[in-house]
Design a protein with these regions (language model features):
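Flexible, compositionally biased loop and terminal segments
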Residues: 2, 20-315
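Residue-identity detector for glycine
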Residues: 5-6, 10, 14, 49
Length: 315
């Protein structure tokens, strides 16, 4: 079962907000007496100096804030996913909309969204999040674009390892994929981040880079066969050893739970091989929002959709 979210963008998000008779100007005034968290400075509103536009912008911000709190109240009543995977798509289209042409600038915007995701997952006590930032198929793109993507990834991973909030929130950073095809500098950045956060144990951030689902399964089978060969197993024994459980033990991050929820941004309804083996019982959520524009309410709506599912695990 799939749910498509964010197809219509309105005052806050989709027709749901506009249809709800409980959300009125009066309810905005009365629902929360403390609006101190809102930034009401002129720079946070419309920059054209028009008082009417500024008032309208402030009203929208208040309505958005109220709607976000409503979503939080709804989802806190039910169980959270343990592991959320996100397929980050839409960087280029978002960049075109903003008039950006330099790949480094385009993908830097997407990389900065990572901080928000970590904040939101920490707030909801989600223990594992996997972000697919670069696929093996992305290697077919132009050298300039590949360089821009990998430069943004390397810079963000380096920043994560040095960020005090990473350690304050006890986030462990890991990377999965065919790292051997990456440059030495990005591999060094990955290994440094993994080493710096190895003792953190409240949240795991798994970064899928140079990753492909088919490649992961092939690599797992190869690792299994190599292990059997090293033990001197006969061919019949090797054949007998190939089971779903044995393959699963040789996946890139075998010790982590399978993803409960997989989110894909930008409106494309496919997995493209993301966590191909592990997603057999995952719930999927697709949103039209481009990755750099992905907001907290988009994330909360995905969590709410997940909570509404009846997960039977084949039963």
């Amino acid at each position: 079962m799939t749910v498509r979210g964010g197809a219509t963008l309105g005052m806050v998000e989709g027709d749901e907000f506009r249809r709800d008779p409980r959300i009125t100007i009066t309810s905005v005034r009365n629902s929360h007496s403390d609006l101190s968290q809102l930034d009401t400075s002129p720079s946070a509103m419309e920059p054209n100096g028009n008082n009417k536009s500024a008032s309208r912008s402030l009203l929208f911000r208040i309505l958005y804030w109220i709607y976000e709190r409503r979503l939080l109240r709804q989802i806190h009543k039910r169980s959270m996913p343990r592991h959320v995977g996100i397929i980050l798509v839409g960087n280029r289209r978002h960049g075109l909309q903003r008039g950006l042409s330099n790949p480094r600038e385009i993908y830097r915007c997407g990389a900065e969204k990572l901080d928000d995701i970590l904040d939101w997952c920490a707030e909801l006590s989600i223990r594992t999040v996997t972000l697919w930032v670069f696929s093996t198929e992305n290697l077919k793109r132009s050298p300039a674009e590949i360089s821009g993507i990998l430069a943004a990834i390397e810079a963000k991973i380096t920043a994560l390892a040095r960020d005090p909030s990473t350690h304050r929130r006890r986030i462990r950073v890991r990377a999965i994929g065919r790292l051997d095809i990456l440059s030495e500098s990005i591999v060094d950045a990955i290994r440094a981040a993994e080493a710096a956060t190895a003792s953190n144990n409240l949240m795991t951030l798994m970064i899928a880079v140079a990753y492909g689902g088919r490649e992961e399964i092939v690599d797992a089978v190869r690792a299994l066969l190599k292990a059997q060969s090293a033990e001197g197993a006969s061919l019949p024994d090797v054949i007998e050893s190939i089971t779903p459980e044995a393959i699963a033990r040789h996946l890139y991050a075998a010790e982590l739970p399978d993803p409960d929820l997989i989110i894909r941004t930008s409106g494309e309804i496919r997995l493209s091989g993301f966590l191909l083996w592990q997603s057999v019982h995952s719930e999927f959520y697709f949103t039209d929002v481009f990755w750099p524009a992905f907001r907290k309410i988009d994330f909360l709506r995905a969590i709410r959709a997940y909570q509404a599912r009846n997960r039977r695990f084949g039963r």
